[in-house]
């Protein structure tokens, strides 16, 4: 059943931010005021945010804030996560595992996952169909 964006993301996002803050990361959230209706699987959302959180802990530069922003695009809405990566991550392969499982879960929800990396800037966009 469709649920409001705030209902879906509030708790798992708060948990992710708390986990990051405990490890010395600063998070800047811009969630806007538009509360769209999305149909998602709550357990996937939790696991996706868990994965994103642990990726950030491994690869993000703690000296730079992690940005989480609400995004509305045509018939879709979701979140953009942006961070700076530390120079020369030890083993890039391990990020791929987390990213693949995120992409799989997003597929199952008919949602899109886009990953962009430019120099030390990393961005992941999650977009869900709006009801």
Language-model regions, residue ranges each:
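Short beta-strand/loop element within the Bergerat-fold HATPase_c
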Residues: 63-75
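Glycine-rich/acidic phosphate-handling loop/turn and adjacent ATP-lid/helix
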Residues: 78-100
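Conserved catalytic submotifs in the C-terminal HATPase_c
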Residues: 21, 26-36, 84
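A conserved beta-strand-to-alpha-helix junction within the catalytic ATP-binding
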Residues: 1-14
